A protein has these predicted regions:
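Homeobox/homeodomain signature
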Residues: 15-17, 125-128, 202
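A sequence-composition feature that detects small, non-aromatic residues
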Residues: 7, 101, 214-216
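Bacterial Sec-dependent N-terminal signal peptides
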Residues: 1-25
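Lumenal/extracellular ectodomains and adaptor appendage modules
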Residues: 22-151, 157-172, 207
Length: 221
């Protein structure tokens, strides 16, 4: 049986853009008290949020897409070298504009800026398609919060797979519309709906997903 992934498909219908600053600049670290739930998985997602913004340059007619991912994850066990790495795809990406990380444990909170993250690129595992950042000194029980943003060329259509290889308590998808219309379709989810919100002072659409299961590596037949 073919594995069904939870997928969003986005269609831009009418394009008319404001010239506000990019919203990724105003996404802050999570300030809520972290509520943990028992899990047998090596990793447990507290949240995994996606932001997509279509942005018109202030100085030219060019339009870009800024995609931000903001995650907070509990490390229960480190059984895989990938558990302490951040892998960012560069496929169809013109620029990685920001990468930040925060490591939280019982005693300390350590934050890494974009300049510090650049020094953590693992050149052996990075190539023209992916950047691999290796976070230092991670221990079991740590909570890792990550934010990164990539810049892409404009495209009328887009899609996003929401699930990960570990369970996620909460996931949000926010499409920052500004002054254009969009059409979002949700596939393989029966309890999630699109709602209109104002995000960073801009007209946006939001979808909330609760208690996402981990994806599995399955054979196709």
């Amino acid at each position: 049986m073919k594995k069904k992934f939870l997928v969003l498909k986005i269609l831009l219908i009418v394009s008319y853009f404001n010239t506000y600053s990019q919203s990724y600049l105003n996404i802050d670290w999570d300030s809520d008290k972290t509520i943990l739930f028992p899990s047998d998985n090596d990793l447990y997602g507290i949240f995994n949020n996606h932001y997509v913004e279509y942005f018109k340059s202030k100085f030219t007619e060019e339009v870009y897409v800024y995609e931000t991912r903001h995650t907070k994850t509990k490390i229960n066990r480190i059984n895989n070298p990938l558990d302490n790495e951040i892998i960012i795809s560069k496929i169809n990406v013109s620029e990685i504009v920001d990468v930040r990380a925060k490591i939280i444990n019982q005693d300390t909170i350590i934050s890494y800026s974009f300049d510090e993250m650049k020094k953590m690129i693992n050149s052996d595992d990075s190539d023209e398609n992916y950047n691999n950042y290796k976070l230092p000194n991670l221990d079991e029980g740590d909570i890792v919060e990550i934010m990164y943003t990539v810049k892409k060329d404009f495209n009328f259509n887009g899609n996003k797979i929401i699930e990960e290889s570990y369970p996620i308590l909460l996931s949000k998808f926010i499409l920052i519309e500004n002054n254009f219309k969009s059409n979002i379709k949700i596939y393989n989810s029966n309890n999630s709906f699109v709602s209109d919100i104002i995000f960073d002072g801009k007209k946006s659409k939001q979808i909330i997903f609760n208690n996402l299961n981990a994806t599995a590596n399955e054979q196709y037949s």
